[in-house]
A protein has these predicted regions:
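Short terminal alpha-helical segments
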Residues: 2-24
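Residues marking helix boundaries in flexible regions
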Residues: 11, 18, 51, 77-79, ...
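Leucine-/aliphatic-rich long alpha-helical segments
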Residues: 13, 17, 46-58, 70
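Secretory/exported precursors with cleavable N-terminal leaders
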Residues: 33, 74-472
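Charged, low-complexity interaction regions
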Residues: 22-36, 55-67
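Short, charged, amphipathic alpha-helical segments
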Residues: 40, 44, 63-71
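Gram-negative host-targeted secretion-system effectors, predominantly Type III and Type IV
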Residues: 4, 8, 29, 341-342
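Short amphipathic alpha-helical heptad-repeat segments
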Residues: 3-10, 34-53
């Protein structure tokens, strides 16, 4: 037998195994060092098998296993090892992206509070969809702008293709459910549509289409922006995709409009623990400079809950089934004497999710409906994306000589006794150029003043929506 060839194949496999754990592998055929690898049983099995074959060959005993069979076996094992390496890298990227999603959410909320008078205005955004749109656009921009985008969205440690890969399974956020399940509210209703409208006569660069088809499923639509019917066609698509929540985009089409990138996300889900309408009462909601009368829902139940000296936080779960991801609304309520900015600072610096514990809580939560339109141009500049709005040729890998003059999020959310319904249109116009024995008293959480809310996909931590309610 060609033992040197087998030795080379085994060392290749062991080197792959070492890579899985980030260790060094020192090649040694006759005296392999003990290796606490990804599959130590495989290593011992292989070395034992080879030792037995060598002993039989030395003793002149014929073996039924030939070199070709062994080589093919080791090739298969090496390919499986390659697959494990790929999966391991994907898992590392998934974990890193989960951290990036959380970091970007709070980075964005902090920037918005700095840029706007957020103690008066309500804030409603979709960090997850903004991040997706920015990643999509990073495929079309130059390298310098791409670096700015990836750093701003907290993904600078990943290369563009790896970031794209994180969105390749976006279709799986759509629940697998029967029509009856959806109609009865047993699972969330989720819709997502991304469209790129571009001026008739403009030619798309095929370079910009290669890497985005699977991750983003963009629908490219040719239109004459100068036509009187153009805005009507666009609004019709928005209204359909948002299930009627958003009817008219707050955007003006001009003679110089060359493209409109648009992403519409819709979410509707029922509470796992619904509020009884009979318990809803008219109560005060306090805001800076006054108070208003609101319909305050209430219930006492076991919730995931956390508090410290600065704020209370609660997780309200939505209905789901085994085929869907889990979704929750997190509410962060400043304690008396503390402000939204203090809470934002703390939840930015520490992970709240793992700190939740099951507690009995008497919760008072207002019904609310918020409708906002938020220009993010200045906010994104503050976050380091100045080049995006300065370039006269912003997306050369898709359309030449176009300038991005804003990125806007326009959305609506309704929260009531049954659950939550929300939609967000993100658009980018472009122009030319264990329980104790004694049951404790339920924790009181009275959401009767400013608070932060997030709708979170539990597994990845993706923030579908976030907001700050200052006044009702």
């Amino acid at each position: 037998m060609d033992w040197l060839l087998l030795d080379d194949k085994i060392n290749k496999l062991m080197r792959k195994v070492a890579q899985l754990n980030g260790d060094e592998y020192h090649e040694s055929f006759y005296n392999p060092h003990p290796y606490p690898g990804w599959c130590p049983e495989l290593k011992h099995m292989m070395w034992g098998f080879i030792k037995e074959l060598k002993e039989k060959e030395s003793a002149g005993v014929a073996t039924k296993v030939d070199l070709q069979t062994l080589s093919e076996l080791f090739d298969i094992i090496i390919r499986l090892s390659d697959l494990s390496l790929t999966e391991n890298k994907f898992q590392q990227n998934t974990n890193a992206f989960g951290e990036a999603v959380t970091a970007f959410n709070y980075k964005l909320l902090n920037a918005i509070t700095e840029a706007n008078d957020s103690e008066v205005k309500n804030v409603f955004i979709s960090p997850g969809r903004l991040q997706a749109i920015l990643v999509l656009m990073s495929n079309w921009v130059g390298w310098y702008m791409r670096e700015q985008i990836l750093e701003a969205i907290c993904c600078k440690e990943m290369d563009p293709m790896e970031v794209n890969e994180m969105f390749a399974d976006e279709r799986y956020i759509i629940p697998y459910a029967s029509k009856e399940d959806l109609e009865e509210g047993y699972v969330p209703t989720i819709d997502l549509k991304t469209m790129m409208w571009y001026q008739k006569g403009q030619n798309l660069d095929k370079r910009g289409l290669i890497d985005i088809e699977k991750p983003f499923n963009v629908h490219f639509k040719n239109i004459d922006f100068r036509s009187p019917s153009a805005m009507g066609k666009i609004n019709s698509e928005v209204e359909k995709a948002s299930h009627g929540l958003i009817k008219n985009l707050q955007v003006e089409l001009t003679e110089e409009t060359r493209a409109l990138l648009m992403d519409v996300f819709y979410f509707k889900a029922n509470w796992q623990s619904r509020f009884d309408e009979d318990n809803t009462r008219t109560r005060n909601f306090y805001y800076k400079g006054g108070c208003s009368k609101v319909k305050m829902m209430s219930q006492t139940d076991d919730f995931r809950y956390y508090e410290n000296d600065t704020f209370q936080s609660i997780s309200l779960d939505y209905n789901s089934n085994v085929h869907t991801r889990d979704y929750s609304m997190w509410i962060h309520l400043p304690k008396q004497g503390h402000k939204i900015k203090e809470v934002l600072t703390q939840i930015t610096e520490e992970r709240i999710g793992p700190k939740y514990e099951q507690k009995e809580v008497h919760l008072l939560l207002p019904r609310f409906e918020i409708e906002t339109t938020t220009s993010l141009c200045e906010v994104l500049k503050m976050m380091g994306m100045e080049e995006m709005f300065a370039s006269e040729d912003a997306i050369p890998n898709l359309l030449s000589n176009v300038r991005i003059y804003d990125i806007v999020q326009q959305g609506k959310i309704t929260v009531n006794e049954t659950g939550t319904e929300a939609a967000m249109a993100t658009y980018c116009p472009m122009c030319l150029g264990c329980p104790p024995d004694v049951k404790p008293t339920p924790i009181e959480m009275n959401v009767n003043h400013e608070f932060i809310f997030e709708i979170v996909e539990t597994y990845t931590g993706n923030r579908l929506f976030s907001g700050i309610v200052n006044k009702l």
